[in-house]
């Protein structure tokens, strides 16, 4: 919390204005934002899941969880009781599949590994990124390239993916 507040304070001292818990269209209009600021960055968060598989057979089976439910319960239980309260979704000894990527998917991978999952597979719905920047992705744009994040590195080390032919970390 202290680290995040320090960064917020640094950005604010550089002239960044933060408007939190604000619904565009209810609390402020998009036009007003565009009129009042040179640049607008919308950080909407990901706490409400998009259930892509709502109509898939078996979606309601026990053991299927949304990422933020898994991560939030884990963090709260860890901070409150070092997991002694049992109020978290335990991946220990389980065969885990993480569907989705980005920071949230990587955090789910890392958390599952730290719990001691039996196995772990991760899927993303986007094609694999190239190893090098494409001509239509020049600097200073964010590089859309293949990365191996900390969770993938931990999974590769634990399960020795380097020895499994055809396995690919993404």
Give the predicted meaning of each segment.
Residues 1-170:
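Residues forming the flavin
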């Amino acid at each position: 919390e202290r680290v995040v507040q320090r960064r917020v304070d640094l950005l604010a001292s550089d002239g960044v204005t933060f408007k939190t818990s604000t619904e565009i269209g209810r609390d402020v209009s998009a036009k007003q934002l565009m009129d009042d600021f040179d640049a607008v960055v919308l950080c909407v968060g990901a706490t409400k899941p998009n259930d892509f598989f709502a109509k898939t057979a078996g979606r309601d089976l026990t053991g299927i969880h949304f990422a933020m439910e898994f991560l939030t319960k884990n963090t709260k239980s860890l901070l409150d009781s070092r997991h002694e309260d049992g109020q978290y979704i335990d991946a220990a000894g389980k065969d885990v599949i993480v569907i989705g990527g980005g920071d949230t998917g990587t955090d789910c991978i890392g958390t599952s590994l730290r719990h001691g999952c039996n196995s772990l597979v991760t899927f993303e719905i986007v094609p694999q990124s190239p190893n090098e920047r494409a001509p239509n992705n020049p600097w200073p744009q964010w590089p859309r390239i293949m990365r191996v994040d900390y969770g993938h590195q931990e999974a590769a080390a634990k399960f020795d993916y380097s020895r499994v032919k055809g396995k690919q970390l993404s």
